[in-house]
């Protein structure tokens, strides 16, 4: 029973047998806490339960919670691999009581589990309590039989937990085990407490107070329990090993790494193997929960984790990307407990492969930049810390690699400046990171929602109804009436108008009343979750509170919206079939005339894949199967295979939309081919969609793709317009529609050939008879002191060709300097300066090109001592630029 998986199941089953609900781990991206970057404790998903904001159908719970501590306040990243217990990803086992049992029962359960079920030696255990918590002290004596010296009173915040400056709080009791005197360290509270001999593995938090203000603390009417046990630490104890990396799970991951590399860990390399094993876990779980590598926020932290592991893989001698080849081993170890790993396996592999491929390229580029930036430094100098950070931040070039590369030359790195730059970047990441909290609604809607309650939505059954005006709002204030020509918003007691949500736009239409009252609805919005607000203008009459109205949704528009919304479901499932189970929705927009669908995928979709997606979706349209909706419990829906939008918060009951007959008959899913949790409006049969045409595919963020599509008459019009364009192109090319692609290819090849010939002719002309330098020499070559200078201004030569001209010029003169200004058609200029190898000690091409650039109205320029380039906005100053180079050479 000492394996990680067995320990996890033993813990959960123990508390289930003692009346606790086993609650699945929440995602690593917190749904209900915008203050956190990542979930870092088991209580995070219950925060609103503890504060009384949210009610659950149970009062006792137990979980095994995925946690990440990397970035922000809790950051273990730099320690991982070099200590026995630090991890970026770990599992927190916990049991929770929401106003049910309290301190005595919590201690009883904990003691029974660790001594009976886990079989720990009582004589090796000791606990801490908050120094004023006499109750906990007495309970440990009573239940465990501890003597006073094994119940240590701690006066610091280590033994008092608080949710924040205000809110629930209370004392803690931590359970420790003495692992023996072969490990350095002392008991908690002693000078040697930072050692690893006495290992804390379970923290019991007794939430019995509420911090009202900084000075005022009161008793909670219903105290609660929150506990957290580190699974990896418990495995360490149960398996009798000194480090979490020696437990079965990590041994298997390290063995897989060794097998992939062809050699195992030794004293010099063991830290790298450990880093890879830990970072593989955090990277994989973050990707499976929807985080993808980027340069800001959560994605920035993930990229740091990934690239740190990839750097260690390279240190171990990996010649090719390694991380993606280890995912199978992680899925084998943890996929049973966390099915999301299995579902996202392909996405995780591809994300790691692409990131490591990019990283290897940036390493090569980074080394080249490092060489250039440090070229003028000598032994004992310090490399600029800001430049070191730019290498890290822009090129993914780690600081330790910069230090290693410069160490052999006796050059250090200004780490203080690097750290300052890092802190600025972290602040930027925090500012750019938008948490997961809901945006605050306008203040006016709070009292209205309190007074009116939720709006009854009738739109699933009808698009026409009667309603009564419950509230009117004008210019952000409640109003008694709206007159003809006035714009405002109104709330009805019931409505068939769909309010914008779930990506579907709000309905439009008209509201008609006696006496010629007509209100044109231009949008319908949802405030505070369930208050439907109709926005528009009074076209005639006067609208008053209590007015009875006939409510008419724009039926044609709603019909098109329904078709586009149902099409998004079919496209979603078709994408999964073509690209893999990792496909997960990240957003959508459903309008009457188009749709877009954003989803997780690490690379562009090929034309062939798009065609297959379109064909599969249209096959289901042609089935003309009935679209069914049913309301069921959220857990029942998920067990039935219903897809949910990542990060969306669902109630206890959800609406499930199913469509597609054929796959159901094959037994793929009992509910249908496409089954999603959805509150939107849909067609009655798939055939009502008419036709689905994919019109675009693009990237919207790192690892997130977007598909755009049309349905019905909009798709037909798009097809007709496309055919008309094809016919026009065929007529212009004097060929058939079928032969248009081949004809265009032939014309493009012919154009490329002519462009090459023209470029060659221009270069020959430039070197043989172009406008010469200011001295007027026909060849453009003159002596500056004892050095030849070929200085020419040419027109119609692209920047990329100027370098080859400079190379040709260097060959012609044998020894000297070549300066060529190319003037473009819009009057701008580019300049290239080349210096033959024998003269680079006297003349630096970078310095010369910068002088010329300044004369052209530009600044800067870069390259190598033997070849550099720059540009400027004023091509008319080409003679002055060449003269400036000559002057600079003369003064050298």
Curated annotation (Swiss-Prot):
PROSITE patterns attached to this UniProt entry: AA_TRNA_LIGASE_II_ALA
Sites where the protein binds Zn(2+): 565, 569, 678, 682
Subcellular compartments: Cytoplasm
Annotated signal sequence range: none
A Pfam cross-reference name: DHHA1
UniProt free text on domains: Consists of three domains; the N-terminal catalytic domain, the editing domain and the C-terminal C-Ala domain. The editing domain removes incorrectly charged amino acids, while the C-Ala domain, along with tRNA(Ala), serves as a bridge to cooperatively bring together the editing and aminoacylation centers thus stimulating deacylation of misacylated tRNAs.
Protein name per its UniProtKB record: Alanine--tRNA ligase
Organism: Bradyrhizobium diazoefficiens (strain JCM 10833 / BCRC 13528 / IAM 13628 / NBRC 14792 / USDA 110)
């Amino acid at each position: 029973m000492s394996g990680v998986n067995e320990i996890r199941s033993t813990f959960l089953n123990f508390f289930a047998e003692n009346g606790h609900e086993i609650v699945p781990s929440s995602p690593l991206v917190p749904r209900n806490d915008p203050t956190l970057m990542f979930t870092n404790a088991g209580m995070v998903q219950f925060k609103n339960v503890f504060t009384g904001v949210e009610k659950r159908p149970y009062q006792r719970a137990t979980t095994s919670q995925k946690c990440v501590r990397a970035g922000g306040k809790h950051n273990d990243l730099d320690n991982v691999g070099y200590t026995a217990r630090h991890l970026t990803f770990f599992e927190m086992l916990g049991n929770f009581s929401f106003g049910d049992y309290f301190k005595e029962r919590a201690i009883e359960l904990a003691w029974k589990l660790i001594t009976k079920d886990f079989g720990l030696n009582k004589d090796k255990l000791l606990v801490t309590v908050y120094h004023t918590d006499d109750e906990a002290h007495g309970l440990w004596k009573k239940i465990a039989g501890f003597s006073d010296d094994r119940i240590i009173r701690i006066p610091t915040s280590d033994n008092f937990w608080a949710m924040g400056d205000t809110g629930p709080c209370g004392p803690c009791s931590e359970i420790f085990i003495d692992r023996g005197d072969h490990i350095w360290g002392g008991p908690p509270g002693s000078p040697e407490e930072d050692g690893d001999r006495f290992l804390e593995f379970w923290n019991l938090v007794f939430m019995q107070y509420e911090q009202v203000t900084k000075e005022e603390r009161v008793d909670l009417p219903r105290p609660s329990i929150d506990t957290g046990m580190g699974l990896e630490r418990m495995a360490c104890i149960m398996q009798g090993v000194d480090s979490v990396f020696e437990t079965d799970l990590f041994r298997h991951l390290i063995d897989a790494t060794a097998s992939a590399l062809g050699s195992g860990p030794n004293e010099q390399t063991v830290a790298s193997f450990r880093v890879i094993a830990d970072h593989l876990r955090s990277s994989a779980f973050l990707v499976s929960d929807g985080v993808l590598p980027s340069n800001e926020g959560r994605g920035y932290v993930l990229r740091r984790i990934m690239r740190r592991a990839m750097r260690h893989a390279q240190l171990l001698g990996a010649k090719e990307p390694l991380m993606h080849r280890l995912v199978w081993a992680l899925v084998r170890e943890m996929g049973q407990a966390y099915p999301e790993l299995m579902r996202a396996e392909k996405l995780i592999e591809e994300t790691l492969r692409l990131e490591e491929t990019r990283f290897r390229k940036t390493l090569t580029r980074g080394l080249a930049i490092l060489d250039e930036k440090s070229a003028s430094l000598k032994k004992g100098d310090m490399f600029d810390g800001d430049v070191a950070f730019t290498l890290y931040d822009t090129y993914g070039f780690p600081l330790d690699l910069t230090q290693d590369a410069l160490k052999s030359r006796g050059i250090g790195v200004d780490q203080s400046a690097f750290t300052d730059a890092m802190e600025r970047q972290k602040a930027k990441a925090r500012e750019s990171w938008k948490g997961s909290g809901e945006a605050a609604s306008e203040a006016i809607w709070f009292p209205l929602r309190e007074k009116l309650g939720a709006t009854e939505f009738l739109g699933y059954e009808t698009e026409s109804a009667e309603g009564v005006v419950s509230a009117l709002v004008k210019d952000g204030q409640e109003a008694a009436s709206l007159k003809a020509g006035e714009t405002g918003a109104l709330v009805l007691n019931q409505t068939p108008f769909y309010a914008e949500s779930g990506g579907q736009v709000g309905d439009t239409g008209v509201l008609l009343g006696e006496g010629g009252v007509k209100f044109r609805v231009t949008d319908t919005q949802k405030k505070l979750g369930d208050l439907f607000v109709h926005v528009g203008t009074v076209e005639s009459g006067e609208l008053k509170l209590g007015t009875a109205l006939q409510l008419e949704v724009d039926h044609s528009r709603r019909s098109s919206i329904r078709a586009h919304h149902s099409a998004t479901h079919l496209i979603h499932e078709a994408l999964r079939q073509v690209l893999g189970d990792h496909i997960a929705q990240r957003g959508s927009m459903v309008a009457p005339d188009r749709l877009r669908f954003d989803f997780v995928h690490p690379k562009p979709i090929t034309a062939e894949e798009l065609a297959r997606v379109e064909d599969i979706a249209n096959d289901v349209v042609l089935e003309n199967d009935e679209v069914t909706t049913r309301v069921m419990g959220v857990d029942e829906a998920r067990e039935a295979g219903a897809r949910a939008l990542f990060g969306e918060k669902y109630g206890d009951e959800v609406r499930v939309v199913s469509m597609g007959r054929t796959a159901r008959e094959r037994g793929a899913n009992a509910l249908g081919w496409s089954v999603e949790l959805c509150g939107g409006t849909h067609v009655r049969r798939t055939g009502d969609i008419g036709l689905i045409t994919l019109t675009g595919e693009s990237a919207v963020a790192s690892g997130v793709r977007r598909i755009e599509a049309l349905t019905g008459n909009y798709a037909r019009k798009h097809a007709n317009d496309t055919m008309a364009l094809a016919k026009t192109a065929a007529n212009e090319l004097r060929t058939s529609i079928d032969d248009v692609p081949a004809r265009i290819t032939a014309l493009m090849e012919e154009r490329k050939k002519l462009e090459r010939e023209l470029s060659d002719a221009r270069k020959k002309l430039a070197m043989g008879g172009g406008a010469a330098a200011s001295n007027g020499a026909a060849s453009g070559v003159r002596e500056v002191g004892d050095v030849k200078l070929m200085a020419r201004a040419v027109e119609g030569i692209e920047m990329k060709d100027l370098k080859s001209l400079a190379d040709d010029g260097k060959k012609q003169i044998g020894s000297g300097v070549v300066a060529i200004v190319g003037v473009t058609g819009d009057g701008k200029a580019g300049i290239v300066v080349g210096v033959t190898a024998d003269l680079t000690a006297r003349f630096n091409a970078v310095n010369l090109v910068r002088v010329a650039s300044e004369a052209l109205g530009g600044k800067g320029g870069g390259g190598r001592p033997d070849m550099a380039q720059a540009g400027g906005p004023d091509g008319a100053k080409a003679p002055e630029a060449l003269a400036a180079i000559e002057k600079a050479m003369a003064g050298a």
